[in-house]
Amino acid sequence: QRTDHWVMDKKHAPYLFFVGVGEYAVIKDKWKNIAVDYYVEKEYEPYAKQIFGMTPEMLEFFSKQLKYEYPWQKYAQIVGRDFVSGAMENTTAVIHHEAVQQKAGQLIDENKWEETIAHELFHHWFGDLVTAESWSNLTVNESFATYSQYLWNEYKYGKDEADYKLWSSLRGYFSDPANISRDLVRFNYHAREDMFDGVSYNKGGGILHMLRNYLGDEAFFTGLSDYLKTNEYGTGEAHQLRLSLEKVSGKDLNWFFNQWFFGSGHPKLDIKYT
C-alpha cells in the first residue's frame, strides 16, 4: 500500500483541480527551482523531451513577456487516452490528448503539438491565476491562450511564421458563417459549451493582436502585467482588462472594447489588384 499527499495552498478555481493515475514513465525536467515533469506512456519515454522539452524555455519567455514570473509551485504535463478535447489547463497538472505522443519519425519534421503546449502553459496566467468571472467572459481565458501561440511563434520562429499561423487561425473563425453575429463577451448562450468556439478562441486572439498593435508593445504587455497583479488568485472580466490597459497607456479604450469585445462582426474588405 502507498499513500500520497498533495497540497495546493494557493487559491484557484475548482474546475481546474485534477488528479491523474496510471502506468506512466515520468521524465523530470526543471526551470529555475521549479519541477517540470512529463508523464507519458512508457513506449514514448525516449521521445518525451522532444515533445515537451521546450517547456522550460516557454516558462522563461512567458514570465519575462508578462513581467510576472510563473506563479505556481510546479508544472506537470500528462497524457490521457480518449480525452474529450485537445488538452486542459488544470492548475500545475495539464492533461493532453494522446495525440501529443509522437515518435522520432514524426518529430523530425515538426512537433505538431508545440502550440498546444504553449497554449496550456499560458493559461496558468490567463485562466488559472486570473480566471474568467463567468463563461460570458471566457475571452480573458481562451483569447489570451490562443494569442500565446502567436507570441511563442514570433519569439521562436519569427514574425512571418507567427503571422502565417495567425491567418490560419482566423480562417477557423471565418469557416463558420454564424460567428459573424456572436459577440466576444456574451451574456446569453444556451450552454456553456457554446462559448468554446471560433469567436472566443480564434477571433479573440486576433483582436488581442490588433489591440497590441494599437497600443504598442510596452503599453500592451505592461497593461497585461497590471491586470494579472490586480486580479491575481481571483476572477477577471473584460472591463478589468480595459481598466489596466487604460491605466498604463493613458488612452480611453471604451470605444475599442465596445466594438470588439461587446460587439460582433468583422471588417469586410473589397480588394482590387491593378
Segments and roles (model prediction):
Residues 1, 26, 271-274:
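Short amphipathic beta-strand and strand-loop transition segments with alternating hydrophobic
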